[in-house]
């Protein structure tokens, strides 16, 4: 029976992996041309920015609802429904662009609807991953990371090539990718329906997710770390792009910078299983955290665009190692009945805090030298590295708590054992086998 279950999990994980790859490549291909089409229709960069903002708004507004629904309803149906909704939204854009009649209202509405669908898919997908994850979860998570980085490399290149064939072609590919991904998810045999002991109100469920993340030390750490690293990385990328632009670097050189960063992430994800087989995870955490600080300090002295790109590639090579370790710990500590809500809380915090990163980078680049700006971000990474080092004992503890944590306040599942709920807030006693993958890893539009 164990062999049969492992074979089924391996098959379903492959379907999950391929569905995400097809979906992300299609979304990346259309995502790079969406602002170009909006700009061609309106002639306004502000309008193109508005469409992008509405896509983000759709995700953020829907995320809390989607997280609760992902812990109540069959997750496979939610994933398939979200993919088909996104396909319908992009089909409307496809027809309008092919007919030569797209309008700003239509593009903005489609972007918002796709953002809504994305939130639904992310929440349900994060809840489903534990059910299909093979026994060697770190290797599987590394493969997911590699898939995401590969899509970030291939998708924009494909989108640019398809755009040369016709403005509507990338949207056709995106629609097809959504439909194919929906079919692959539908073929998963594993029951993805969440465990549910008691039906409570929507607000009660939402508060339970927030409370669980805050009271579980490891989940609280991972949430803060992920938000901080995404903020710093987002600002660093904008810093490099803006600095290169002010120095007169050609667009091709800036594109090379981003490509090198993505390639570094891909290599890091592919090499993660080998690293984990030879080095203790906590050793990897300490080394990677402080090595990224050193690389950004060196970046403060870089003057050539290719040098920025090489250093970014090395930074992004290290970051998947940390991401896989932290995701694996979160998977061990999150109950099945809480996965959707926990993933939503962690992802939403990260996205909200990441939003001002481009603005901060722009202000710093305008007011300070490239050296000072890079050192500011190196200092921010040093704070994160120190925070990570201080939490090593908790990260390595079986129940995710450290010696300073009150066992009466946060038991093995991180819930308050003195509030008399006995798990009725949506938790259960099987927390040690549960888990999530953050939306940063699992996305409809990469």
Spans of features found by a protein language model:
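Helix-loop boundary and gating motifs at the non-cytosolic
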Residues: 2-60, 211-261
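C-terminal transmembrane bundle of multi-pass solute transporters/carriers
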Residues: 61-65, 76-78, 85, 92, ...
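Helix-breaking motifs and short loop linkers at transmembrane-helix boundaries and internal kinks
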Residues: 42, 74, 96-101, 302-303
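Juxtamembrane intracellular "pre-TM" segments in multi-pass secondary transporters
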Residues: 1-14, 190-224, 406-411, 442
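Structural signal for membrane-spanning alpha-helices in multi-pass inner-membrane proteins
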Residues: 35, 90-97, 159, 163, ...
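Substrate-agnostic recognition of the 12-TM MFS/MFS-like secondary transporter fold
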Residues: 15-31, 55-70, 74-89, 106-161, ...
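Hydrophobic alpha-helical transmembrane segments
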Residues: 104-115, 139-193, 255, 259, ...
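Hydrophobic/aromatic positions within or immediately flanking transmembrane alpha-helices
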Residues: 17, 49-52, 79-80, 108, ...
């Amino acid at each position: 029976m164990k062999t049969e279950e492992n074979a089924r999990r391996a098959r379903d994980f492959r379907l999950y992996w391929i569905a995400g790859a097809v979906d992300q490549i299609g979304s990346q291909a259309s995502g790079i041309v969406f602002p170009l089409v909006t700009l061609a229709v309106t002639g306004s960069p502000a309008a193109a920015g508005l469409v992008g903002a509405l896509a983000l708004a759709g995700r953020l507004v829907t995320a809390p609802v989607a997280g609760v629904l992902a812990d109540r309803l069959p997750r496979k149906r939610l994933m398939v429904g979200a993919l088909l909704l996104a396909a319908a939204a992009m089909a409307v854009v496809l027809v309008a662009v092919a007919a030569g009649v797209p309008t700003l209202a239509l593009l903005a509405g489609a972007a918002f609807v796709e953002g809504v669908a994305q939130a639904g898919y992310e929440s349900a997908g994060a809840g489903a991953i534990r059910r299909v994850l093979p026994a060697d979860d770190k290797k599987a998570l590394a493969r997911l990371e590699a898939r995401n980085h590969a899509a970030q490399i291939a998708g924009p290149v494909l989108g640019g090539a398809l755009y040369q064939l016709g403005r509507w072609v990338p949207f056709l590919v995106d629609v097809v990718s959504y439909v194919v991904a929906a079919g692959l998810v539908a073929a998963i045999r594993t029951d993805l329906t969440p465990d549910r002991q008691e039906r409570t109100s929507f607000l009660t469920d939402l508060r339970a997710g927030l409370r669980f993340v805050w009271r579980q030390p490891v989940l609280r750490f991972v949430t803060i770390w992920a938000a901080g690293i995404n903020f710093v990385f987002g600002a660093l990328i904008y810093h490099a792009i803006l600095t290169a632009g002010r120095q007169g670097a050609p667009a091709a050189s800036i594109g090379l910078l981003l490509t090198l960063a993505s390639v570094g992430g891909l290599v890091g994800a592919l090499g993660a299983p080998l690293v984990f087989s030879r080095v203790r995870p906590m050793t990897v955490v300490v080394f990677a955290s402080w090595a990224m600080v050193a690389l950004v300090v060196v970046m403060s002295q870089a003057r050539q665009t290719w040098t920025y790109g090489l250093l970014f590639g090395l930074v992004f090579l290290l970051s998947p190692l940390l991401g896989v370790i932290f995701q694996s710990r979160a998977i061990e500590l999150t109950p099945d009945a809480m996965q959707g809500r926990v993933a939503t809380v962690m992802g939403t915090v990260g996205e909200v805090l990441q939003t001002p990163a481009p603005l901060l980078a722009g202000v710093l680049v305008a007011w300070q030298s490239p050296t000072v700006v890079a050192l500011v971000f190196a200092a921010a990474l040093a704070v994160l590295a120190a925070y990570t080092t201080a939490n090593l004992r908790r990260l390595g503890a079986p129940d995710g708590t450290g010696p300073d944590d009150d066992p009466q306040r946060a038991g093995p599942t991180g819930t308050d054992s003195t509030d008399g709920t006995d798990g009725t807030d949506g938790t259960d006693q099987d927390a040690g086998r549960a888990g999530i993958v953050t939306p940063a890893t699992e996305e409809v539009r990469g």
